[in-house]
Amino acid sequence: MSTIKIKQVKSRIGAPADQKRVLDALGLRKMNRVVEHEATPSILGMVEKVKHLVAIVK
């Protein structure tokens, strides 16, 4: 599998609890932090749930 880099670009303040849990599971706790994960279906599904808060970095 390939890896993807995910960056949190918007604040989690005001986001529903389930979206905050997804950010925690991805390892994103602060703005502008970048994490690297394998591009598995579960990770891509989590990114889809919080796509308005994160960006995929090339």
Swiss-Prot record:
Pfam families: Ribosomal_L30. InterPro entries: Ribo_uL30_ferredoxin-like_sf, Ribosomal_uL30_bac-type, Ribosomal_uL30_ferredoxin-like. The keyword Ribosomal protein applies. One of its GO terms (molecular function) is structural constituent of ribosome. One of its GO terms (biological process) is translation. The keyword Ribosomal protein applies. GO terms for cellular component: cytosolic large ribosomal subunit. Keywords: Ribonucleoprotein, Ribosomal protein. SUPFAM superfamilies: Ribosomal protein L30p/L7e (SSF55129). Part of the 50S ribosomal subunit. Belongs to the universal ribosomal protein uL30 family. HAMAP family: Ribosomal_uL30_B (MF_01371_B). This is Large ribosomal subunit protein uL30. It comes from Phocaeicola vulgatus (strain ATCC 8482 / DSM 1447 / JCM 5826 / CCUG 4940 / NBRC 14291 / NCTC 11154).
